[in-house]
Amino acid sequence: MAGDVQILRRKGDNCCRDIKDIVNILMSRGFTNEFLSDHGDYYLFSVNKPGYDDDGRWYLDDASSWAVMYVHIIKDGFSIYTVEDASGQKTDYYRYIYIEGYGDRAFMYLNFLHEYFKLFPDDIFSGAADYLYTKEDIDRIYEKEIWSEIWHCLDPKTL
């Protein structure tokens, strides 16, 4: 199942300094070839793997070997989502990373998100069906023994 998804950031400091951390996460997962192109208000970032290693957990049930991400370094003029917490306080979230063609790379990206949220716990992930996932949701899904390959299309409360 293909679909584009995104990581949303609530603070307005989208900047290129975090790209280094994103690259480091992907490199630690076996991606060694990357391409970064500056488009002014966002970077087009793509990576791929040169080979396959069956010993790595991130390869289980996921035959993907490339990823395309658009990293927005300038905050959009309007928020993508406004989230209301239990106390009624509303928080605006802005697009930070747009991930192209999530689909059959669900486990690879779950692994990426698990590491990403260790560094940026206040960001949220917007799945293919516009469900919002917090760091806690991603951690819970990641730790499951059995998980659905379409987890990013399902309500995180049901997972």
Map each language-model feature to its residues:
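Charged interaction segments
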Residues: 56-159
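Residues that cap or initiate secondary-structure elements
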Residues: 11-15, 51, 77, 103-105
